[in-house]
UniProtKB/Swiss-Prot annotation:
Catalytic activity: D-ribulose + ATP = D-ribulose 5-phosphate + ADP + H(+); L-ribulose + ATP = L-ribulose 5-phosphate + ADP + H(+)
Cellular component annotations (GO), alphabetically ordered: cytoplasm
EC number: 2.7.1.16
Domain of life: Bacteria
Pathway in which this enzyme or protein is active: Carbohydrate degradation; L-arabinose degradation via L-ribulose; D-xylulose 5-phosphate from L-arabinose (bacterial route): step 2/3
Species whose genome carries this gene: Citrobacter koseri (strain ATCC BAA-895 / CDC 4225-83 / SGSC4696)
Protein name: Ribulokinase
């Protein structure tokens, strides 16, 4: 038996999963929460700042791995052949000449700018817009061509530029920047020095403007035109070569071998983003749209190179050769908020209960139980009486919009309220909004000639809330496959580890043995689908109209209204 371990670094926690490479059996798993993040450290939500301390990653990873390894028998621990890594992204951090994340140094230990800038940190909206404008300068190369045409504040260079402008001490100490999904494999293999790091194709292609057609990263002149401060502090190019995640970055270094009780022969595979590896763990085949659903969504589709050709798909988060499966084009999209929208509504409704608990401590336990039941009760109530004829129309931009056409200035909108709108109806409007966002992504692909043969959903919401998934199915008006595994991203990371360790010859072969099954296929309900179609058209009308209110101040609104934005009441 050969065993591979997948590490999945999420927004709140890290998961370790041990998998039998021959059968795909999930042998042992452990989730460890980030302690500082749980306390809200280094974050400023009103200003869209979300940072992770590297010690959160190190401590939680070590605890999760040790827990999993303790669960294995002595003989099984001897059969661990590889460790694979996925993470959120773009989640970069500044490192010094020795490869240490700056926040690991005493003088930067409490400086959020010296930490990992989490994917959902939107402090760099202006920098992202500047990158987009520069890419679209007439007569110059459009380096946004293969990342959907718009650069996002959730991505690598925007975050680097923002921190570099804001914090001169960090800018001077940073020898380079590294994505979380590249840093963890480098840490485990002892290859963290900037010149030793093997940069992943996934993160470089989707978030860093890296592409083969212009020889890697944009030229130094591009960054001079953007802001000379980048080249003043960072050596160009930051990196040149990139590697697919099925290739090893090295083996377990002596320090981590000793800490974990594993041999130094354990192979460390290349890193990639969580949802890309999640699609592999789900067993996705070409032209399957895989929705990884959690606090937000990431939507992944792979297509063969011939079918994509030289087409540049607009409005998405990139198309990258080998970002998901080697020798296929990986296309990424996503919604900036999904589960987070439901959680927001739960907090709104729960606020009076929190005040009541503070005033009456004897009721605290009972109120806490009631708070946990808020969303399940709302879901059940709306499912019994969907009331689509009186459903509020909601725009799902509560955390901006990722796809189509990234724009983090956008805000959520709730419309069509009246005095009869009750809590279940409003919650139903939020459910419909997240489903409409999913359909907008599907259409972003199909309207540009990228076929979507089937749709798959994975993650906790996908498996545990059939009401929400059925709404998505009805809105998409096509079957929706629910993937069985609760931990597809970690499973995908384990699959890449198995290939890097030569337990399988390639990713498709490993998927046949190790990928998750589909546990359920939902079918659209014709009557509901027809009513949702009408609501979706209103969603599109509101989207076009509302977007004009969130344009940058320097951008005038169109003088003539877009015809499809005409609202009828």
């Amino acid at each position: 038996m050969a065993i591979a371990i997948g590490l999945d670094f999420g927004s709140d926690s890290v998961r370790a999963l041990a998998v039998d490479c021959a059968t795909g059996e999930e042998i042992a798993t452990c989730v460890e929460w980030y302690p500082r993040w749980q306390e809200g450290c280094y974050c400023d939500a009103p200003n869209n700042q979300f940072r992770h301390h590297p010690r959160d990653y190190i401590e939680s990873m070590e605890a999760a791995l040790k827990n999993v390894l303790t669960t294995l028998s002595a003989s099984q621990r001897g059969e661990v052949v590889g460790i694979g890594v996925d993470s959120t992204g773009s989640t970069p951090a500044p490192i010094d000449v020795d490869g240490h994340v700056l926040a690991l140094r005493p003088e930067f230990a409490e400086n959020p700018n010296a930490m990992f800038v989490l994917w959902k940190d939107h402090t760099s909206v202006e920098e992202a817009e500047a990158i987009t404008r520069l890419c679209h300068t007439p007569g110059k190369t459009d380096y946004s061509r293969y990342i959907g045409g718009i650069y996002s504040s959730e991505w690598f260079w925007a975050k680097i530029l923002h921190v570099t402008r804001q914090d001169s001490a960090v800018a001077q100490a940073a020898a380079s920047w590294i994505e979380l999904c590249d840093w963890v494999p480098a840490l485990l293999s002892g290859t963290t020095r900037p010149q030793d790091i093997r940069r992943g194709r996934c993160s470089a292609g989707h978030k860093s403007l890296w592409h083969e057609s212009w020889g890697g990263l944009p030229p130094a002149s591009f960054f001079d035109d953007l802001d000379p401060i980048i080249n003043r502090h960072l050596a160009w190019p930051l990196f040149t070569d990139t590697f697919t995640a099925d290739l090893p970055v090295g083996t377990l270094c002596a320090e981590w071998a000793q800490r974990l009780g594993l041999p130094e022969s354990v192979v460390i595979s290349g890193g990639a983003f969580d949802c890309h590896m999640g699609a592999v763990g789900a067993g996705a085949q070409p032209n399957a749209l895989v929705k990884v659903i959690g606090t937000s969504t990431c939507d992944i589709l792979i297509a063969d190179k011939q079918s994509v050709g030289d087409r540049a798909v607009k409005g998405i988060c990139g198309q990258v050769d080998g970002s998901v499966v080697p020798d296929f084009i990986g296309l990424e999209a996503g919604q900036s908020a999904f589960g987070d929208i439901y959680a927001w509504f739960g907090r709104i409704l729960g606020w009076p209960l929190e005040q009541l608990a503070a005033q009456h401590p004897e009721l605290k336990d009972q109120i806490a139980i009631s708070q946990k039941q808020l969303l399940p009760t709302l879901t059940e109530a709306w499912a019994k009486n969907p009331s689509l004829d009186h459903l509020p129309v909601v725009l799902d931009w509560f955390n901006g919009r990722r796809t189509p056409n990234a724009n983090q200035r956008l805000k959520g909108v709730i419309s069509d309220l009246n005095l009869a709108t009750d809590a279940p109806a409003l919650f139903g409007g939020l459910i419909a909004a997240t489903a409409f966002g999913a359909r907008a992504i599907q259409e972003c692909f199909t309207e540009q000639g990228i076929a979507v043969n089937n749709v798959m959903a994975l993650g906790g919401i996908a498996r545990k809330n059939q009401v929400i998934m059925q709404a998505c199915c009805d809105v998409l008006n096509r079957p929706l496959q629910i993937v069985a595994s609760d931990q597809c991203c970690a499973l995908g990371a384990a699959i890449f580890a198995a290939v890097a360790a030569k337990a399988h010859v390639d990713i498709p072969a490993a998927q046949q043995k190790m990928a998750s099954a589909v546990e359920n296929t939902l079918q659209p309900r014709p009557e509901q689908a027809q009513r949702f179609e009408q609501l979706y058209q209103r969603y599109r009308q509101w989207a076009v109209s509302a977007e004009q209110h969130y344009l940058p101040t320097a951008t005038p609104a169109p003088k003539t209204p877009v015809s499809q934005a005409t609202l009828t009441h």
